[in-house]
Amino acid sequence: MPWVPNLAYPGTWMRLLQADVHAGVYAMAGRLPAGLAVGTHRHTGAVHMFTLSGAWGYREHDYVNRAGSYLYEPPGSIHTLYVPDDNTEVTETLTVVYGTTEYLDDGGAIVAVSDAATNLEAYYVSCEAAGVPRPAAILR
């Protein structure tokens, strides 16, 4: 699967490895630059996240995930992902997401959602923008 720029987060790259829109699960590899911040969000299903290089954390916790770490997020988890400003290398992750990710405003209201279907479409749009043919092997 090709790496393509993630149009939702400038400076990031994504590689969608698998998307099962019927089961509501997808596997995504990401390359995240220093200083990245992702909006506060809640997961309706479990998330498994492997850190392959670099470091990242959640604003709500002191722990920083580093290369070689694994993180399990239970359904209902709410957090704000960030990559430290002083990272000296790109952070690369592999994430398996079940269910929906709900992006929240400061009051906790849902302002956007993503899931296997929206990530599949976003990947296709990013492939087209990068002039990369749509891979057919990522669907169940």
Task: Tell where the protein language model's regions lie, with residue ranges.
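A short, N-terminal "cap"/entry segment at the start of jelly-roll beta-barrel domains
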Residues: 1-24, 114, 121-140
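Conserved short histidine dyad/triad with adjacent acidic residue
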Residues: 11, 15-18, 23-42, 74-78
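Short acidic-glycine-tyrosine-enriched beta hairpin
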Residues: 21-22, 48, 56-80
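Short glycine/proline-enriched turns and hinge-like loops at secondary-structure junctions
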Residues: 25, 42-44, 63-64, 85-86
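A short secondary-structure junction signal
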Residues: 28-29, 60, 105-108
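Short, conserved beta-strand element in jelly-roll/cupin
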Residues: 31-33, 41-58, 94-99
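Ligand-binding loop in jelly-roll beta-barrel domains
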Residues: 66, 75-106
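Short intrinsically disordered coil segments
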Residues: 108-118
